[in-house]
């Protein structure tokens, strides 16, 4: 549970060389392939676009997000668009790889570039969002969320750029 995490995290170094940097990458060792079989395939960009264009009886958080396409039967979310960057997939992957026990982040199954659009394939995390639950949260709930977010921020602050290999704030 996040609430009982230690707050004295050891600094973790992150280098661009440790990040997967291909335009098209699939993490065959991810839970998607463990759960669906080694020969399972992620939806192609054409399939994602087709699903995004299909009229849906979807309400809530998915109703107004054409750039986030859920594939509920596969427990898969594909985020895509021309303003999306592979760096977002790299960041999610790096945070889960280095801080996964302390920072809740969806598992990334892969990403690809198709023309000027990037597609990031990730775990579909189901449940209520804070936005949806806001009106029903008690002061105790708010305090717990505050503590959890505090520990998450401390964990994120433990990430450091490798000396001589800085990439954040470089441009």
Give the residues covered by each predicted segment.
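Juxta-kinase regulatory segment immediately upstream of eukaryotic protein kinase catalytic domains
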Residues: 1-58
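ATP-binding pocket architecture of kinase catalytic cores
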Residues: 32, 53-171
């Amino acid at each position: 549970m996040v609430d009982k995490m230690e707050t004295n995290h050891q600094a973790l170094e992150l280098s661009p060389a440790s990040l997967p940097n291909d335009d098209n990458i699939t993490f065959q060792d991810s839970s998607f392939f463990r759960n669906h079989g080694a020969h399972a395939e992620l939806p192609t960009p054409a399939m994602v676009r087709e699903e995004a264009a299909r009229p849906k009886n979807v309400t809530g958080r998915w109703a107004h997000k054409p750039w986030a396409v859920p594939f509920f039967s596969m427990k898969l979310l594909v985020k895509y668009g021309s303003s999306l960057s592979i760096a977002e997939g790299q960041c999610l992957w790096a945070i889960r790889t280095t801080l996964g026990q302390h920072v809740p982040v969806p598992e990334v199954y892969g990403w690809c570039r198709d023309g000027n659009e990037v597609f990031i394939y990730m775990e579909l995390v189901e449940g209520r969002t804070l936005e949806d639950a806001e009106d029903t949260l008690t002061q105790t709930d708010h305090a717990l969320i505050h503590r959890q977010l505090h520990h998450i921020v401390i964990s994120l602050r433990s990430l450091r750029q490798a000396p001589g290999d800085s990439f954040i704030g470089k441009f």
